[in-house]
Amino acid sequence: RDRFDDLGNAEIFSTWCFNLEYKEIPNEVIDKIKLIFMDSLGLIFASRNEDYIKAIKQSFTDSGNCTVPGHLEKLCPSDAIVLNGTAIHGEDFDDTFEGTPVHVGSVMCSSLLTAAEYYKLKPKEILKGLAVGSELMCRLALVSPMAIHKQGFHPTAILGAFGASIGISKILKNSVLQTTSSLGIVGSMASGIIEYLAEGTWTKRLHPGWAGASGWKSAHLGKNNFKGPRTVFEGKNGIFNSFADSKIIPDFKKLTDDLGSYWHTNNLAIKPFACGTMTQPFIDCAIKAREKINDLNEIKSIICKVGEGTVHRLWEPLSEKRKPTTPYSAKFSVPFCIAVGLYFGKAGLLEFTEEQIKNREILNICSKISYEIDPQNEYPKNYSGEINIILRNSRVIQETQPGLRGGKLFP
């Protein structure tokens, strides 16, 4: 195509990807990617003995030559990516993005870790793959904020497949046409519904690894000249017309404007707590309030001011959120996370267990927590928290957290 205006968004991004040199990636972006990579490696080890990891390992039927940190088995590339991605995301302690929550490290680090070993890549090649894939995931998240969640899909699962696809395409040195096709192909592989919220089941954990493996498959198909639609993003049946709520109009300028001169990857955040992204500011509020309460039994009620876009995932059904049925569902319950913050003063891996979801003192606090939608809340542009604790003597303790700790406002 001779005219840039005629190019589809996938072609524009693929052209930038193909031409990108390592020296063009800002140092602060490289530093952020390295931090995310190290964080992800730690999480692979942290979850290596969890039941869901054992279940995935036992499901594999093929062997290979790819290593998974913390495990003796050698796997084929796609299985290694699935296991690594699930391990990184499994405890919801991995990085997140402010704009629409997507978990970049669990997809990109699992994919490029396997690619690095399989293709014996040099460090700069790995970092280039991580950079382009991370940037695509972040920019796709900004095209139509909240729309994918509202439609019932997990943004990391859908958008992550594209990040992995272009990251692997970069290290394979796919041409612009091959990379564009790879993105078009992976659009038919992307999937991941949020019905796990209903009963706190494990499927969300699987999403990043599956997205990464889809990226691996699609990039290799593109490398061998299998054709995919170049209008996979903006087309009539593209992902934003298939996986996103039509009431939220996509802004495709977010995908390509300032490409190369502004890096959204630099806005990736490291979570302080092992639970859902939007629970984090409320835990900070709870920990601050804890210092002002002599006895947690003095609490009469707790009212939280929240963004409307968080309610369907983290607050409703309120009966389930006040009494989570599994340790995993507890990670996506703001009432439980607040109660944990008040009770323990922290919210790490050991605060979300079978023992704690049955802890009567924690559940008693949960039963007192409710929410009000705040029209002024900036979600998803900013992740903030506000709680008002009413004590039995009518004293009110108000705490706010203006932004996500580990994010752009509180790095």
Language-model-derived ranges and their functions:
Residues 64-65, 136-143, 189-197, 311-313:
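Secretory-pathway/luminal and periplasmic proteins that interact with or process carbohydrate-rich
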Residues 107-109, 152-171, 181-254:
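Amphipathic alpha-helical interface segments
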Residues 87-142:
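Hydrophobic alpha-helical hairpins/lids featuring a short glycine-rich hinge
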Residues 41, 108-115, 130-140, 161-169, ...:
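Buried hydrophobic packing segments
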Residues 1-102, 203-213, 220-411:
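Terminal-appendage/accessory-domain detector
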